Amino acid sequence: MSTGLNAGMRLTGNRSRSIEDVPTIVGIDHGFSFPLRYFEVHQLAPDWPTFLEDFQRHWPADAEHTYVDFIRDGAAGNGAARTGNARWRRVTEQRSGSAKSVFHFDVPGSVVKSTHAGIPWLLYLRRQFGARLHFWPFDGWSIPAGMSAVVEVYPSLWKHRFPSHDRTPDQHDAFSVASWLREADRSGQLARFLKPSLTPAERAVAGVEGWILGVA
């Protein structure tokens, strides 16, 4: 499955192709950053690359045999020095209407564990691919022609639009994301969702907190 985008990207389901072979848009279902309040409390510069480095040092979930719960329990890393409050929500989570806080541990439907586990791997990808991979919207709201991109997605926005058939919930989430991206591409709506209607102040905050693709 592949579709051509106006920006020169393609959505592909062929796993034998790398993002360098075919420009690809990759949707990942977890938070890419934290609310601005987190940066303020921990006295961090509002800068996403700096955040990635700092977070990985405290929550090294990319290390071998290291899990989020190990870090929470103090057996690895120093997660206690980089925690947040479940009441803190990013602008995009507030705008979505239903997305939970990236600090809301131990509740159904939360992506907090996958967020804490996944952010160090975003740093890994950034180190591996450098400028060859666009992290939206941190590297800019416009994705350069011919470049692959990684975006944050929230399957709950779209999964009810597609019959689940015999898929597991996780399989249906992945199917729904891929199907929506394909439809949005073919209809010309994807370009609009890559540039949501935000005030200058909201856009500046989202450049630090990140944004869920598809949230208007």
Specify the residue positions occupied by each region the protein language model found.
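RNase H-like (RuvC/DEDD) metal-dependent nuclease/polynucleotide-processing core
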Residues: 1-216
